Amino acid sequence: MVLPRFYAASSRAALQAARRAVPFTGVRGYAAAASSQGKVRAVIGAIVDVQFEQGQLPAILNALEIDTPEGKLVLEVAQHLGENTVRTIAMDGTEGLVRGENVSDTGAPISVPVGRETLGRIINVIGEPIDERGPINSKMRKPIHADPPLFVEQSTAAEVLETGIKVVDLLAPYARGGKIGLFGGAGVGKTVFIQELINNIAKAHGGFSVFTGVGERTREGNDLYREMKETGVINLEGDSKVALVFGQMNEPPGARARVALTGLTIAEYFRDEEGQDVLLFIDNIFRFTQAGSEVSALLGRIPSAVGYQPTLATDMGLLQERITTTKKGSVTSVQAVYVPADDLTDPAPATTFAHLDATTVLSRGISELGIYPAVDPLDSKSRLLDAAVVGQEHYDVATQVQQTLQAYKSLQDIIAILGMDELSEQDKLTVERARKIQRFLSQPFAVAEVFTGIPGRLVRLKDTISSFKAVLDGKYDHLPENAFYMVGGIEDVVAKAEKLAAEAN
């Protein structure tokens, strides 16, 4: 048995080859070539082989279309097999597809609608609306495959992106145009945290957000959409702040492997054409890798470590390198990271970690204390927490906060066994301040106001630094712990303390 010879190329090389084969309009625009027709020759799950006439072979990464009774099925060219045959990845189910069906070459990669018309809408991997609210009347479409911005276009300055969330801005600040890993199990407030970030970015920076559900549960996507409508992040009658792109768990691997690029393309438009600071959420980046692994095996590539695709680092790099800051605007990415069997050395999370600028860890232990957002102040890290980037005062305050919380953590066993009375006076003071800091790191969210009844607070970075500095200096040692819980800045603490005192009298 003679196996066909595979010409597996990296996506970057394929894109360059496609550019040689297909005339381009502009830097990232494609001019559609004359449509050529082919026939389905084999269907192997999510992989479809298509044969064309001599001299009409479509370029790698081109989109092909098949008209089916259910609608249009889009295929993406992955390999040239020889004998005028291409191997393609299906973006939808291939059930009912038979040999001999007609296939047309679009002459360009998959393109999706971009612009403000996408805000408040839910779209799939090929840019079709799936929210039953009619077509998206976008004036422009962009291909999902693109090169990262050139070095001369990129901004090299390390700049903090203010989120208005105290614990993040103080202890694990986000880089403008950076990549943040969001670690959190079920029920620790990940969705609310994401919604608040979307809300705050819109308020503080006037920017938009793109939420990309990669291989997530359909129920979770539905819940997120409903919650966003309830909290006003999505406004069906007026301006919305977010576009939703979903490729759920039940989708074929081709859709799950490409849906992250669809979301990124929409975000890139807001950055490059409108000069916006865009927030891109990817939930879950592991599913992107997992889908690539499924597709790779079907394409006949020899698996590497733990069964992952041999192109794992390349695939991840092509996605992550497009998430960056340019001189026009930025795309800041928050990526939920699933760690298989809690093994951080697994190739999928290990490859992701190489690209991250900051990690935000949501802790079940902290959420059980009723402290929200349940961000672990000792486990969450950022490369921006450096005196040269954030300034000496910010760095000193953040370091002292972490040292105080760490000292409290190490004293907890002694307190549990012997009680507070056995501690030295200095340790007692440390514990009291640490407990106040712990509560002060909580914050009422605007998107949770409908549930808690507490108005949300967006706290500026300079106010956060000065507030925590005052607590560390002992200026508010006389105030009760409860006054520090679920408030914004230090003026809110004083007001709450006065209110508590008045109620007590």
UniProtKB/Swiss-Prot annotation:
SUPFAM superfamilies: C-terminal domain of alpha and beta subunits of F1 ATP synthase, N-terminal domain of alpha and beta subunits of F1 ATP synthase, P-loop containing nucleoside triphosphate hydrolases. GO terms for molecular function: ATP binding; ATP hydrolysis activity; proton-transporting ATP synthase activity, rotational mechanism. It comes from the Eukaryota. Keywords: ATP synthesis, ATP-binding, CF(1), Hydrogen ion transport, Ion transport, Membrane, Mitochondrion, Mitochondrion inner membrane, Nucleotide-binding, Transit peptide, Translocase, Transport. It is found in: Mitochondrion; Mitochondrion inner membrane. GO terms for cellular component: mitochondrial inner membrane; proton-transporting ATP synthase complex. The keyword Ion transport applies. It catalyses: ATP + H2O + 4 H(+)(in) = ADP + phosphate + 5 H(+)(out). Its main location: mitochondrion. F-type ATPases have 2 components, CF(1) - the catalytic core - and CF(0) - the membrane proton channel. CF(1) has five subunits: alpha(3), beta(3), gamma(1), delta(1), epsilon(1). CF(0) has three main subunits: a, b and c. This is ATP synthase subunit beta, mitochondrial.
